[in-house]
Amino acid sequence: RLFYTQGDYGLWQCSEPCHQNTYDNEEAVRRMLAEQRDMKVPSELVPRCPVCGKPMSMNLRADNTFVQDEGWYTAAARYSDFLHQHGHEAVLFLELGVGYNTPGIIKYPFWQMTAQNSKAAYACINYGEAACPEEIESKSICINYNIEQVLKDLLG
């Protein structure tokens, strides 16, 4: 299971935000890609909030405007339940491309849970930022390489 605690590039949200809903953006993004010219998207394709009319933005935790909608809370509860039920078992805390923008959300908790669970392992793939604390070094794999290439190599 995946929990996009930091957001999802596949969702729009109001840039204000005037409400706590997100919207699937795949169709709109594909249309933007198809119709862009000279690296510009036609202004009529720029998404607008259906409630207040302000521009929409990606659903990413970049500042205090991040929208946590019903789906986010449902996924957060699933994640919490998983950790409660399986956090003492053999588990791999896999981190893909997590930097130091908000390390307290993913990185530090993963390190902490790895240190506290003798059966846990930590792995990160992040070009330029693959590291772990000395305390969990013996049960960690840090790959300082391009994620896309690593996944292609793993999948053969």
Segments predicted by a language model, with ranges:
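Conserved catalytic alpha/beta core of Sir2/sirtuin-type deacylases, generalized to analogous enzyme cores
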Residues: 1-156
